[in-house]
């Protein structure tokens, strides 16, 4: 027999030790059964049985108090096998945690896209009301039309207020999940070795710049990228389909025209 024990022999040794421990437990159980089987008066049977069990448990308790914890086996191969099994359990738990984090990231991306879609819809509605307002200014306003105009104006104010709340909610969402990158390499994108520039802007500001450009000059919606645009944020927006590059100039980007 060689000095080293194969994993199969280690398992067999571990099983033998477990069987020995089980036999000792069976002996203790047999002793308890014999104690419980002693004849007692029928009237005191339950009390005597309970007292016997109490004494047995108390004796077992004192015995365990005197014992020190023991390893199941001192065989290095057995301990190595048990350690490998424990590592496999830890690995599975970590894989489950990783899967949960990935699902959460996907959910955050979906929430961002949904918030952007809601914002674009409100921009469309606001632009439609602005067009109606301009057309009505060119016409002769009658009393009835004044009332309609006032109602539309109130609705437009409500939409502006709703847009403001929506922008605030979007800003809070982006600040929570996409904060400004920290210096000294503490940014979210660890694969970027260089530190972020001093004047880097948030992802919320990037979207606001692109949105203002699209609304003010829809015929020229592109914005030139400078050092204040942090590359990881640009990649995230490009991968999500929220931002598009200029077909001829990669340094210029625009907001996706979701309303078209």
UniProtKB/Swiss-Prot annotation:
Instruction: Give the subcellular location.
Output: Nucleus; Chromosome, Centromere; Chromosome, Centromere, Kinetochore
Q: Cite the entry's keywords alphabetically.
A: Centromere, Chromosome, Coiled coil, Kinetochore, Nucleus
Q: What's the short name of a Pfam family annotated to this entry?
A: CENP-K
GO CC terms: inner kinetochore; nucleus
Domain of life of the organism in this record? Eukaryota
In terms of InterPro entries, this protein maps to: Centromere_CenpK (IPR020993)
Biological process, per Gene Ontology: kinetochore assembly; mitotic sister chromatid segregation
> Coiled-coil regions in this chain?
84-173
Q: What is its main location?
A: nucleus
| Family from the record | Belongs to the CENP-K/MCM22 family.
This chain's protein is named Centromere protein K
Q: What is the lineage of its organism?
A: Eukaryota, Metazoa, Chordata, Craniata, Vertebrata
């Amino acid at each position: 027999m060689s000095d080293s024990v194969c994993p199969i022999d280690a398992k067999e040794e571990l099983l033998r030790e477990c069987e020995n421990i089980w036999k000792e437990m069976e002996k203790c159980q047999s002793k308890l059964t014999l104690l419980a089987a002693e004849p007692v008066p029928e009237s005191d049977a339950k009390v005597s049985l309970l007292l016997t069990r109490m004494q047995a448990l108390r004796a077992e308790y004192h015995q365990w108090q005197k014992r020190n914890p023991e390893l199941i086996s001192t065989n290095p191969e057995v301990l190595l096998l048990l350690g490998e099994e424990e590592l496999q359990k830890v690995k599975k738990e970590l894989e489950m945690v990783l899967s949960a984090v990935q699902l959460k990231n996907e959910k955050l991306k979906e929430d961002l896209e949904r918030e952007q879609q809601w914002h674009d819809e409100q921009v469309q509605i606001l632009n439609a009301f602005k067009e109606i307002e301009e057309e009505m200014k060119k016409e002769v306003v009658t009393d009835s039309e004044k009332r309609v105009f006032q109602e539309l104006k109130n609705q437009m104010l409500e939409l502006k207020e709703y847009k403001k709340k929506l922008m605030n909610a979007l800003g809070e969402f982006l600040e929570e999940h996409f904060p400004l990158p920290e210096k000294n390499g503490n940014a979210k994108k660890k694969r970027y070795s260089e530190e972020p520039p001093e004047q880097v802007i948030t992802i919320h500001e990037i979207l606001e710049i692109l949105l203002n450009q699209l609304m003010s000059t829809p015929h020229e919606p592109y914005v030139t990228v400078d050092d204040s645009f942090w590359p990881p944020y640009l990649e995230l927006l490009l991968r999500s389909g929220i931002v598009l590059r200029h077909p001829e100039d990669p340094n210029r980007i625009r907001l996706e025209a979701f309303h078209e």
